[in-house]
Amino acid sequence: NSRIAFFNDSIRNAIKGSVFESDEKGFVQGNEKYASGIRYGARANTKKYNWLAQAPSQCVTYAACHDNATLYDKIICSTDLANYDERSEDAVKMNKMAGAMINASQGITFMLAGEEMCRTKYGDTNSYKSSPEINKIKWQNLVDYADVISYYKGLIQIKKSFTPLTSMDNTYFDNFTFGGSR
């Protein structure tokens, strides 16, 4: 049924590294072994790529959700760029790159609340039972990460205005190329 979608763990891992290995880097942290995973994920892992989705409507494209580390936490943990509650310009660039990959991909775009403002749960990967202090959204980040929020708004506008990215069928599949290859 094309109306039932799956969370695409393949692109999640390609973007930021495995959620089960805290120090593993994904493509945004410089791990080039995940380049093909980004290419497949951008096309919602459909058609020839041995995944469950037959069309973009069945693929939820994401980098983080309520399970496991936030995107910013995974970047910090795998790179040691800063403490969780510190702004790292390199980590911000990686967060922006992840946002670009999600929004430049076919499928249903999903983002964890606060991803656009580099939300942290201070490395807690199983926070359902953690304190409100860990789980709350730090509203000061609206100011501290205003540039990232603006960037994400732009990404969303681009995606909304570009039909090949919002199409939920395989009409545009063959139009995706990466450096001249598919």
Language model feature labels by segment:
Residues 1-113, 117, 128, 163-165, ...:
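Conserved alpha/beta catalytic core and glycan-binding cleft of carbohydrate-active enzymes
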Residues 77-86, 133-134, 141-145:
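Non-catalytic scaffold segments within catalytic domains of secreted glycoside hydrolases
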